[in-house]
Curated annotation (Swiss-Prot):
Ligand binding (L-tyrosine): Y37, Y175, Q179
GO molecular function: ATP binding; RNA binding; tyrosine-tRNA ligase activity
Protein name in the entry: Tyrosine--tRNA ligase
Keyword Transit peptide: no
Species this chain originates from: Sodalis glossinidius (strain morsitans)
UniProt similarity note: Belongs to the class-I aminoacyl-tRNA synthetase family. TyrS type 1 subfamily.
Amino acid sequence: MASSNLIQQLQERGLIAQVTDEKALAERLAAGPIALYCGFDPTADSLHLGHLVPLLCLKRFQLAGHRPVALVGGATGLIGDPSFKATERKLNTAETVQEWVEKIKRQVSPFLDFDCGDNSAVAANNYDWFGSMNVLTFLLDIGKHFSVNQMINKEAVKQRLNRDDSGISFTEFSYNLLQGYDFACLNKQYGVALQIGGSDQWGNITSGIDLTRRLHQNTVYGLTVPLITKADGTKFGKTEGGAVWLDPSKTSPYKFYQFWINTADSDVYLFLKFFTFLDLAAIDALEQEDRASDKAPRAQYVLAEEVTRMVHGEQGLAAAKRITASLFSGALADLTEDDFAQLAQDGMPTVHLERVADLQQALVAAELVPSRGQARTLISSNAVSVNGEKQASIDYVFDDADRLYSRYTLLRRGKKHYCLLNWQ
């Protein structure tokens, strides 16, 4: 992705929501490598899918020869960004935020190259400059450059001020100053000339541009990526179980993979542009192939493979595909003990049973049927599988061969209703 047409390529992928002085930024990028940054506040112990587009945008710039700075908000994470939030965030302790900072730094690292010469990535933490700053320095060196009139007219703040049920605290109101100063600090330390972020960050970004000009007399730029919405209007990156996280202990590679497999046809080609590095010609060709085929679209599988590999590596992708194939075919021999643990983690209904139990008892305990009578009916109708094998004996009692890894048995009612038995 050459610098000379990087902005154009981002536009073609739909990755630019707003940009300050697009022509001047394009000329600056064409003139040579720049440093740019994106901030990630530790508001949880993991990044989620909403962070992925700006994070991948940093990577796109690095691939074009520019130097990315990943800023983790050890200070701003203590305050909480009020932008377009209906109520004030719950404040977390310094110890909790510091723990989350370290986790997020580890999550960001695999996406960027920290050892590639002049455009090696940098990891920064804004607690380094805010942690020892006293209130007088803050007011004199930063506060005097901000107009309260302008701050309260920013859309993100205005929405909170206009709500009858909640206002905005001075703590959150100050967030805009902190993020603005981040830009000025990074401009001085690393020559950062561009900040990228989600479109909800536009007000904070423009504040940083103005403060950098006032403090250092430097011209810098801002670019926002769109907040992702689905074609049906529902929120992207959420499932019935909540957010889709990048941490495999919070959202397993299998569940992550399934999230992308279930992408609607109306969204999948756009998401390939947002979340993968496939060139546009390949994405267009895939779309034409899918439209001409009478088979299920291939795009969802391409998307799921590309993004799962990027986030969880080849091993995570292999596990996700193995579990998917085994559940679909009913052949469980290829599943590892860790795969079964993933299924339990992902929320597959799991019940703990004593070693002596029959199939009827297990079906009732698993809440696949309400009674033994209905269990007998279901078994007789050949609608129950034990580890992928149909079981038609109403008197069936489990034996050691049914306990995979001496611990797990997978029950299925019909085609879609599963329960994992965990033997004591």
